[in-house]
């Protein structure tokens, strides 16, 4: 039996990236202040409306609510999914014969979620379910949100992998018994997941075959021409 049978994955800055245009309505630092405000957090929890959020944040940061709306719309328009990572997760799921379930867990308001769902190149069918902060009434790193997702999906924490780009969110997941991975870049995440789900023996054998004739010893990036490692590999594999 595989050690893990579920993945809880963040959406923004993991499966989706955004890049505001150079002539963005609000400077990037100002936009980040909007998105990290306590009022915005209440909006993501579904406790206030979109217009109420824009009005309050505008007063708090001395910004026009109209400019906030335009900046959010521009950011949503720039959203792109990491199709390579999505395809990788699809292949990983298929390789388990359906035993692996994949869920999304995102801090997001309902209007922004609706905008996210309109991104055309995303394969939403990869998810068995999607958990949002506006539906849960809580947001990461609040433990209430994790417990909500675990209960709704009937997940065993020790058999669930949690992926997020924010360390504080991963630490909260780990406190609930999940195996947390901090997302930094797609290639690293793929390698981590292969290590967790793949057969290490098969992976090692595949590496030997793919690199046959090039299995030299390396030290500090320098190839060392010696025979011991070659003879050891030959003895263990009986394969030239």
Located regions from the model:
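Non-catalytic pre-domain segments flanking phosphatase-related domains
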Residues: 1-9, 199-211, 215-220, 227-228
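Active-site neighborhood of HAD-like aspartate-dependent phosphohydrolases
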Residues: 2-37, 41
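Generic structural signal for small/hydrophobic residues in well-ordered secondary structure
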Residues: 10-13, 46, 104, 130, ...
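Short, solvent-exposed loop/turn segments at secondary-structure junctions
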Residues: 14-15, 20-22, 107-111, 136-138, ...
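A metal-dependent, Asp-based hydrolase signature
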Residues: 41-73, 228
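Short, acidic loop-to-helix structural element flanking the phosphoryl-transfer center
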Residues: 69-103, 143
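Substrate-recognition "cap/lid" segment bordering the active-site pocket of phosphatases
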Residues: 110-160
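Acidic, divalent-metal-coordinating active-site segment for phosphoryl/phosphodiester hydrolysis
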Residues: 145, 165-178
């Amino acid at each position: 039996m595989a050690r893990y049978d579920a993945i809880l994955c963040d959406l923004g800055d993991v499966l989706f990236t955004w890049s505001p245009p150079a002539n963005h309505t609000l400077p990037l630092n100002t936009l980040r202040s909007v998105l990290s405000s306590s009022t915005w957090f209440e909006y993501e929890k579904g406790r206030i409306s979109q217009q109420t959020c824009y009005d309050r944040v505008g007063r708090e940061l001395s910004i026009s609510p109209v400019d906030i709306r335009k900046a959010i719309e521009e950011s949503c328009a720039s959203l792109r999914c990491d199709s390579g990572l999505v395809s990788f997760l699809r292949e990983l799921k298929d390789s388990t014969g359906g035993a692996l379930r994949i869920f999304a867990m995102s801090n997001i308001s309902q209007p922004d979620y609706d905008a996210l769902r309109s991104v055309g190149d995303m394969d939403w069918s990869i998810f068995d379910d999607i958990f949002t902060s506006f539906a849960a009434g809580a947001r990461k790193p609040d433990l209430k949100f994790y417990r909500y997702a675990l209960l709704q999906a009937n997940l065993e924490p020790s058999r669930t992998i949690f992926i997020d780009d924010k360390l504080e969110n991963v630490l909260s997941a780990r406190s609930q018994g999940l195996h947390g991975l901090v997302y930094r870049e797609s290639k690293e995440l793929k390698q981590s997941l292969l290590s967790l789900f793949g057969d290490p023996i098969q992976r090692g054998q595949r590496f030997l075959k793919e690199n046959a004739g090039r299995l030299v010893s390396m030290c500090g990036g320098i190839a060392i021409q010696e025979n011991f490692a070659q003879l050891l590999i030959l003895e263990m594999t009986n394969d030239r």
